[in-house]
């Protein structure tokens, strides 16, 4: 498997890295990419009550992210087209960190020492991450594909 989680959005042009990822996978191997969701750019500023920024985010793909550095976002469709053109067939995509991403904004914290709470949270996140419309609102998405025969 070839994994690239949280890197693509820091590159101005994703194509060179996507080329390398797809080329590195063996026939039948998995390519796994996580990146920012261009269709949900308004979520974070809206949750932070930065209404002007949220309104502007509907028409942008760039932001200063949580790490304080510029980043860009992709759509599931565009990234699927990129990997498909390089011999990797997209299998599924998931929304990532949908509800846990919002906890801090609501004043609620997840207690990592409460194993029952962690298990329940993970179950809800997994279910939301694979269902529409929930996964479409995730600020990050996870695309999983399989490389075709050589």
Task: For the regions a language model picked out, list residue spans one by one.
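Short alpha-helix
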Residues: 68-93
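A conserved beta-strand element that flanks and buttresses the S-adenosyl-L-methionine
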Residues: 3
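Active-site rim elements
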Residues: 66-70, 130-132
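A short glycine-rich, Lys/Arg-flanked "PGG" loop and its adjoining helix->strand segment in the class I
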Residues: 15-30
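A C-terminal cap/extension of S-adenosyl-L-methionine-dependent methyltransferases
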Residues: 92, 96-150
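Conserved class I S-adenosyl-L-methionine
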Residues: 30-59
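Short catalytic micro-motifs in class I SAM-dependent methyltransferases
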Residues: 6-7
């Amino acid at each position: 498997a070839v994994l690239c989680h949280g890197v693509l959005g820091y590159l101005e042009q994703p194509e060179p890295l996507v080329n390398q990822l797809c080329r590195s996978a063996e026939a039948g191997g998995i390519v796994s990419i996580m990146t920012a969701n261009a269709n949900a750019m308004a979520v974070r500023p809206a949750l932070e009550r930065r209404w002007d920024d949220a309104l502007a985010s509907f028409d942008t793909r760039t932001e200063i992210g949580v790490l304080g550095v510029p980043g860009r976002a992709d759509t599931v469709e565009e990234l699927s087209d990129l990997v498909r053109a390089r011999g990797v067939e997209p299998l599924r995509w998931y929304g990532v960190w949908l509800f846990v991403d919002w906890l801090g904004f609501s004043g609620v914290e997840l207690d990592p020492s409460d194993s029952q709470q962690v298990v329940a949270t993970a179950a809800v996140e997994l279910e939301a991450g694979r269902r529409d419309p929930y996964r479409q609102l995730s600020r990050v998405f996870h695309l999983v594909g399989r490389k075709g025969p050589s």
